[in-house]
């Protein structure tokens, strides 16, 4: 069972028992999901079905999608998700947490744990493309050493924001930053 901890949060494999708290804390919250590529879940069964699909990836030899719970250590409650999309020596990274837990450094800690985990897999380049209006996520990424490569025009659709493709920030963490990050992450 995969589990990595920082001072206040852990990233770990999801469990079916996470469905209710994860729906309540994050996946069912329309505001928390506004910058995702899908709508908020409508009920806990939708969250349970998603968790079952995501858990099936854990046993694959080379999974192309890894969704982990972000757990607050004190309460041992799942408060969000960390999504990794490894592909050979590079990966995408995405994260989100409940609005109730924002502003405490949890997303930054979870992102750093994700970077360290990807390094352990031999990943040397990590990228992500948050919506240009998602200032909190962009700030977390900058704290973790990601560098803006510019704006990706009409890059992705965010259903909560409408049907039109939205502009996103092209953020990357390259090999040099990864080596530096490994020394500075503790």
Predicted regions span which residues?
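Hydrophobic alpha-helical segments with strong N-terminal bias
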Residues: 13, 41, 53-56, 83
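Conserved GNAT-fold acetyl-CoA-binding loop/helix
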Residues: 33-53, 66
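Acyl-donor (CoA/ACP) binding surface of acyl/acetyltransferases
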Residues: 1-21, 25-31, 71-186
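Helix-loop element at the rim of GNAT/NAT acetyltransferase active sites that forms part
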Residues: 24-39, 59
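A short helix-loop-beta-strand connector motif used in the catalytic cores of GNAT acetyltransferases and
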Residues: 53-69
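A short hydrophobic/aromatic micro-motif that marks alpha-helical segments and, especially, helix-coil
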Residues: 43-45, 58, 160
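Residue-level recognition of short, structured coil/turn motifs
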Residues: 37, 63, 120-123
């Amino acid at each position: 069972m995969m589990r990595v901890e920082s001072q206040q949060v852990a990233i770990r494999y999801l469990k079916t028992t996470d469905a209710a708290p994860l729906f309540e804390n994050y996946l069912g919250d329309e505001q928390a999901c506004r910058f995702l590529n899908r709508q908020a879940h409508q009920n806990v069964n939708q969250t349970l079905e998603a968790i079952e699909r995501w858990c099936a990836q854990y046993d694959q030899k080379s999974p192309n999608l890894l969704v982990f719970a972000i757990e607050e250590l004190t309460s041992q409650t799942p408060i969000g998700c960390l999504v990794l999309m490894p592909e050979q020596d590079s990966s995408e990274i995405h994260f989100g947490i409940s609005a109730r837990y924002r502003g405490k450094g949890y997303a930054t800690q979870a992102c750093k744990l994700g970077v360290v985990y990807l390094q352990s897999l031999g990943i040397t380049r990590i990228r992500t493309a948050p919506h240009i209006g998602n200032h909190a996520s962009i700030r977390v990424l900058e704290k973790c050493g990601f560098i803006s490569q510019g704006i990706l025009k009409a890059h992705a659709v965010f259903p909560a924001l409408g049907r039109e493709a939205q502009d996103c920030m092209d953020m990357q963490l390259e090999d040099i930053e990864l080596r530096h990050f490994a020394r500075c992450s503790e």
